[in-house]
Amino acid sequence: MSKIYDVIVLGAGPSGLTAGLYAGRSRLSTLIIEKGQDGGQIAITNEIENYPGQQLEGESGPSLIARMTEQAKKFGAERVSDVIKSVELTGDVKKLIGNKGEYLAKTVIIATGAFPRPIGCKKIGRASCR
């Protein structure tokens, strides 16, 4: 039988890592599941000028995310890489089914973040990376 976590966080961007950090800090068994690299949109940011509660002059997105990931780990949050295919959020124990296995939790936090969406313009491909 799979371990039942107190909290599973879907997504390891700034919001997901913060949720995982505070859940772990509260001594809740915590698992962070991310399909790609940690950081989401902030991982591709060269310089962060404004972040709540921090003075981060000249810090890059990847360095901030590395610190956040390390803090979450320090407070006991586990992390796995997987793509979640389906979820069952009814009942006391929630079930998430991914490519690599099944995950169980009392609480699920969805922090899947933002991603660019095409606007439907035929010629957008030429200009989208400028």
Which residues does each PLM region occupy?
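FAD-binding core/adjacent interface of flavoenzyme oxidoreductases
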Residues: M1-L10, S26, A77-R130
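Short low-complexity stretches enriched in small and charged residues
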Residues: D6, K35-Q37, S63-I65, I109
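Glycine-rich FAD pyrophosphate-binding loop
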Residues: I8-L10, G24-I44
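Glycine-rich NAD(P) Rossmann-fold beta1-alpha1 loop
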Residues: G13
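N-terminal Rossmann-fold NAD(P) dinucleotide-binding loop
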Residues: G16-L17
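Glycine-rich, flexible loop/turn motifs
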Residues: D38, I44-N50, F115-G120
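N-terminal Rossmann-like dinucleotide/flavin-binding domain of flavoprotein oxidoreductases
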Residues: A43-E102
